Amino acid sequence: MPSVRKEFGGECWTCSEQARDEFGLYWIRGAPGDGIHTDPDTILHGMNSGHQAINLACVFGAKRILLLGYDCQHTGGKSHWHGDHPRTLGNARCVAAWAKGFKQQAIHARLRDIEIVNCSRATALQCFPRSTITEAL
């Protein structure tokens, strides 16, 4: 994490109090479930960091969110575009369950007039409108 903090100029957020304390990250309360939480101090984890990132964007007031790398499938036999995580972190074993969570999130976003566009090149997600990143920008 220290090398990421050096190279990445943006904010780093976590739902883990341990990671907050160990790495000096911004912290927000995480709760189990799918969709978008109604409490602005809490995000729903949806069993994956992509779900959490959408929730965090909503907390920050985003009205349009463009998704990249949301494949929700094992594209090319890989569990992640960046390679496997260490064993302790897990490696995308429940992508079908993630898709169900994103479907709930899409419903919540529409109810809040938040546009979410999936600009991922390869994806199993059908719940968000699709576009290329070039067209969406």
Predicted regions and their residues:
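Metal-ion/cofactor- or nucleotide/acyl-coenzyme-handling active-site neighborhoods
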Residues: 1-137
